[in-house]
Amino acid sequence: MIILIYLFVLVWEEAQGWGFKNGIFHNSIWLEQAAGVYHREARSGKYKLTYAEAKAVCEFEGGRLATYKQLEAARKIGFHVCAAGWMAKGRVGYPIVKPGSNCGFGKTGIIDYGIRLNRSERWDAYCYNPHAKECGGVFTDPKRIFKSPGFPNEYDDNQICYWHIRLKYGQRIHLSFLNFDLEYDPGCLADYVEIYDSYDDVHGFVGRYCGDELPEDIISTGNVMTLKFLSDASVTAGGFQIKYVTVDPASKSSQGKNTSTVSGNKNFLAGRFSHL
């Protein structure tokens, strides 16, 4: 059964900053491999890390805090995060590719808060490690299967991965779960996958999933979708495989009625856009 997410369809103007060519983002990029820059937040959520803690997070993973130039290089190939984070030398900012009224003050580029005199301020972190293990990426292919790190083996502790799917204007994304096995807890607070009907993990929250019950299919309202995978420091499990295919505007599969079985899924926390 398919959960149709009813929102206003996202209509974007073509922007060179996304790397668009003829209306499509023309290259699929593993952000960690292409630029070495990735976003990290505290286990307890956004904006919880002091400068010293942010440095420690990056160094624990074999990297270091990204410089302004490294973050800008990542931004130029599509790295977009609507969350301010520490950089090297005590600088704070975040990369914006597509301007929006709710993020980046309608601007593109690095939204720069400058070098902070108070290193006890709490933000996220932008780390740099060109040898980081693949975990997340940007997909623009019409269809693809992607997996949790190490699948079919168990994923590691302390993972935070982001996948961004971006298709042609007017197309939608049909997401299907092929395998799903994460640590279970009633609130999905330990290990989980979150899905967002947007190009970041701030807007369009669909839901949070954990346990071993296969989630329902999901169809986006627009041509973008974001998935976030997080694991804690204790129990691991088998991981997941997720498939997406492109839904063209005239496709019948995108015209069905919205029917939801959220109430029957004990391993699901609903977002405001998951059902009517």
Swiss-Prot record:
Distribution of this protein across tissues and organs: Vascular smooth muscle cells.
Superkingdom classification of source: Eukaryota
Signal peptide: 1-17
Keywords, sorted A to Z: Calcium, Cell adhesion, Disulfide bond, Glycoprotein, Hydrolase, Metal-binding, Secreted, Signal
A cellular-component GO term for this protein: extracellular space
Residues linked to a glycan: N118, N258
Link domain span: 36-129
Disulfide bond residue pairs: C58-C127, C82-C103, C135-C161, C188-C210
Protein task: Major regulator of extracellular matrix organization during tissue remodeling. Catalyzes the transfer of a heavy chain (HC) from inter-alpha-inhibitor (I-alpha-I) complex to hyaluronan. Cleaves the ester bond between the C-terminus of the HC and GalNAc residue of the chondroitin sulfate chain in I-alpha-I complex followed by transesterification of the HC to hyaluronan. In the process, potentiates the antiprotease function of I-alpha-I complex through release of free bikunin.
Record note on quaternary structure: Interacts (via Link domain) with inter-alpha-inhibitor (I-alpha-I) component bikunin. Interacts with ITIH2/HC2; this interaction is required for transesterification of the HC to hyaluronan. Interacts (via Link and CUB domains) with ITIH1. Chondroitin sulfate may be required for the stability of the complex. Interacts (via Link domain) with various C-X-C and C-C chemokines including PF4, CXCL8, CXCL11, CXCL12, CCL2, CCL7, CCL19, CCL21, and CCL27; this interaction interferes with chemokine binding to glycosaminoglycans.
Name assigned to this protein: Tumor necrosis factor-inducible gene 6 protein
Naturally occurring in which organism (per UniProt): Oryctolagus cuniculus (Rabbit)
Name of the gene this protein is made from: TNFAIP6
